[in-house]
């Protein structure tokens, strides 16, 4: 199925290829992937603790400086890893989590 899709794209006209690229969720960089996140947005973040956590996306958000974020995840990472980076940088306004035990900043 996937190979048929890519075959059609490879031999499609330019307009069709542009249309596919515009709807694709594959980004060339982490910064590009998070550029539409605005101050005050709500983010659902996967992973379990720091395992499977989207580290590159979190670093890109930290670098771009979005603030007043509401974040929903199972925890807030640790001080300098995972969501702990955003918490320490005061970019998270509200954190919804089921476990608070590993991050001293979050426990306060």
Over which residues does each language-model region extend?
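Conserved alpha/beta enzyme-core scaffold
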Residues: 2-108
């Amino acid at each position: 199925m996937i190979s048929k899709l890519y075959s059609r794209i490879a031999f499609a006209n330019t307009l069709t290829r542009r249309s596919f690229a515009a709807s694709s969720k594959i980004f060339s960089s982490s910064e590009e992937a998070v550029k539409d996140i605005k101050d005050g947005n709500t983010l659902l973040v996967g992973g379990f603790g720091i395992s499977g956590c989207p580290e590159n996306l979190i670093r890109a958000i930290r670098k771009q400086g979005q603030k007043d974020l509401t974040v929903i995840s199972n925890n807030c990472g640790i001080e300098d890893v995972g969501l702990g980076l955003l918490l320490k940088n005061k970019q998270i306004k509200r954190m919804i989590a089921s476990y608070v035990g590993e991050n001293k900043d979050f426990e306060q």
